[in-house]
Amino acid sequence: MPSKLQFYSEFAERTARQITGSYRSWTAFLATAARLYKYPYNEQLMIYAQRPNATACAEYDFWKDRMGRYVQRGSTGIALIDTSGYQPRLRYVFDVADTAPRDAARSFTLWEMRAEHEAKVCSMLTEQYDVPQDGGIIAQFERVADKLALEYWTEQKRDICGIVADSFLNGYDEDNIRMAFKTAASTSITYALMARCGFSPDGYFEPEDFMPVFDFNTPAAVSVLGTAVSEISQRVLRQIEITVKRQERERRAERTEEHGEQPDLQDQRRISGPRPEPARESA
């Protein structure tokens, strides 16, 4: 009988083989990964496989000690494979939906990018990545994703070219591998940014936009692609988070100063329904 570690290792490998098998599978993974953007790819994969609708995950002690929340009876932890030590081991996290607040619990909210944040986010993206603002924020997301995907390829192309064996990339020359990787990564990053920032990427992209993703059809190949998408998305989303939260703090401070109101600690709401996005520009 396999150990739990072996069971979950094989489970992760099966999931990795499946997620690039179709447009729906890959974008479903991206939607989960976008919500859990602070986790690395391998842990995003495990969370997606066990709890695809998870929104915010943390270990038991974090919920109990830092947030003043308790894990509800009967909740099942999400198993993650921890490779940070000398030997792999399992650790478990719980989604916020598995928890409930104690009397002295800290307020728990997820940041949300709303229409009033877009101007500052656009300015931040221009400053950080030297991309123009014309065409709106979705066009900016695409430009940032294109730029960072190409930078990632330049830095990691030896490793990327080293995983083509047994995948549909096998037989491609370096230039075609570069094109496949850049397109797959850039499209996926843009999808993740849109999903986390409240837009509807499924209404923006066509399944054909993800065709290069399907070439990454082995665990090693999807790991390279997934790691790139995860690392780049995390970098950009952390900067967006900082920008949004800073604007909210400034707005609350102004309200308090002008009207003598107490800061609204609950103003950052959970993400509601996605906002409509601008029409996609034709090529």
Predicted regions mapped to residue ranges:
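N-terminal accessory/interface modules of nucleic-acid-binding and processing proteins
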Residues: 1-283
